[in-house]
């Protein structure tokens, strides 16, 4: 009798535990305020201990700055997604404006990849250099082990081929791709050269001073230090140059004086020669007059002698 009662109690306990497991309701954890605002929480949760294999979907491009860039890197490191697409662009760059529609379309075609658009004015040049961004626009695909940079044209087919080669994810079928939003293409589509714009602080140093103050001060310090090191050499070179200039000036002045003296000597010689020529002419004239006077006197005396003898 006691054995039967004990067996009955064991059966009742087993049925109670089974009923509790059967009525256990699966649920998902509630989203925090951060996840609701950022929208970075996984869109799936485990139900009855089974984890869904479906990845979250990202249907739009997220505009961000350095904080969002760090969030994108955290998504990679925490395995929230396999790849992250980063577009570095500038509002003043015409190539960025023409590339942005293609980026919006590719984000809808690859909705499993989060797409971030980082504006040039909201990020430091040192961060751009860290990611190898030397012009705009620049598109990067990142995962936990590699970083691929897009170097093709702005055409949608080229972007799809790049995404497929890097991620291995196939996009929509050809019909869906043709029905997608049309993307305007500016310029020559046959041109396969990448088009980008340089940095703004490369064109205007005041932007660099405003955005990278410490870098600008470091450059100024290096230049002043270099000037301090080469200052003695500059002084010696300047003294040598001044001596050469003064010596040349003295030689030029001496040459000018010599030429002046020679010109004066030539003028004096010419003047003396003209005086001698004038004196010679005067002497000849005087001699001719003297001879004429003597001849006249001789003729008159001979006439007188002849008259007296008669």
Swiss-Prot record:
Residues 49-168 form the Thioredoxin domain. SUPFAM superfamilies: Thioredoxin-like. Keywords: Glycoprotein, Membrane, Signal, Transmembrane, Transmembrane helix. Glycans are attached at residues 143, 190. It is found in: Membrane. The chain crosses the membrane at residues 217-237. It is a single-pass membrane protein. Residues 1-22 form the signal peptide. It holds the Pfam family Thioredoxin. GO terms for cellular component: membrane. Its main location: membrane. PANTHER family: 5'-ADENYLYLSULFATE REDUCTASE-LIKE 4-RELATED. This is 5'-adenylylsulfate reductase-like 4. It comes from Arabidopsis thaliana.
């Amino acid at each position: 009798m006691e054995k039967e009662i004990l067996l009955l109690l064991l059966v009742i306990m087993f049925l109670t535990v089974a009923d509790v497991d059967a009525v256990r309701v699966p649920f998902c954890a509630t989203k925090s305020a951060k996840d609701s605002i950022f929208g970075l929480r996984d869109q799936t949760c485990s139900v009855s201990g089974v984890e869904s294999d479906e990845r979250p979907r990202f249907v739009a491009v997220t505009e961000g700055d350095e904080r969002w860039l760090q969030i994108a890197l955290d998504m990679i490191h925490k395995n929230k997604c396999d790849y992250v697409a980063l577009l570095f662009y500038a509002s003043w760059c015409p190539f960025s404006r023409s590339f942005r529609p293609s980026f919006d379309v590719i984000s809808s075609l690859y909705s499993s990849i989060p797409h971030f658009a980082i504006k040039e004015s909201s990020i430091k040049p040192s961060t751009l250099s860290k990611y190898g961004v030397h012009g705009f626009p620049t598109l990067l695909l990142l995962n936990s082990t590699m970083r691929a940079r897009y170097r093709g044209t702005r055409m949608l087919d080229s972007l799809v081929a790049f995404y497929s080669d890097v991620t291995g994810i196939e996009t929509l079928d050809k019909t869906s791709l043709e029905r997608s939003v049309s993307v305007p293409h500016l310029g020559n589509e046959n041109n396969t050269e990448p088009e980008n714009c340089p940095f703004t602080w490369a064109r205007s140093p005041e932007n660099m001073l405003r955005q990278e103050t410490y870098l600008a001060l470091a450059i100024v310090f290096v230049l002043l230090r270099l000037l301090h090191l080469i200052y003695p050499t500059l002084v010696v070179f300047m003294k040598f140059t001044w001596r050469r200039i003064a010596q040349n000036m003295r030689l030029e002045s001496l040459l000018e004086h010599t030429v002046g003296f020679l010109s004066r000597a030539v003028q004096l010689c010419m003047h003396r020669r003209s005086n001698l020529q004038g004196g010679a002419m005067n002497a000849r004239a005087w001699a001719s007059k003297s001879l004429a006077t003597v001849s006249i006197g001789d003729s008159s005396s001979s006439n007188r002698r002849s008259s007296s003898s008669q």
